[in-house]
Amino acid sequence: MRPYNVIVVMVVLLALVLHAVLSQHWSYGWLPGGKRSVGELEATIRMMGTGGVVSLPEETSAQTQERLRPYNIINDGGYFNRKKRFFHE
């Protein structure tokens, strides 16, 4: 390559790298520069003003029973037998 072509390629690569490095990452709920919106800050301050206690809605008894129900245990002999590979053997 001629020196002119090498310089052009280097300038293009530098521009691409600078574009990637200087671009800002936008996440959900965040503004550029890592700042949150004022509405979320207000809600956080209000919650802190209540003593940090957040009231949760009451659960129905069916939801509580579903959450506390134990898993079904199919087989207590949970060891691995290398010789027995298939169920029919």
UniProtKB/Swiss-Prot annotation:
Pfam families: GnRH. Its main location: secreted. It comes from the Eukaryota. It is found in: Secreted. The keyword ATP-binding does not apply. Transmembrane segments: none annotated. One of its GO terms (molecular function) is gonadotropin-releasing hormone receptor binding. InterPro entries: GnRH (IPR002012), Gonadoliberin (IPR019792). The modification Glycine amide is found at residue 33. Keywords: Amidation, Cleavage on pair of basic residues, Hormone, Pyrrolidone carboxylic acid, Secreted, Signal. The modification Pyrrolidone carboxylic acid is found at residue 24. GO terms for cellular component: extracellular space. Residues 1-23 form the signal peptide. Belongs to the GnRH family. Stimulates the secretion of gonadotropins. This is Progonadoliberin-3. The lineage of its organism: Eukaryota, Metazoa, Chordata, Craniata, Vertebrata.
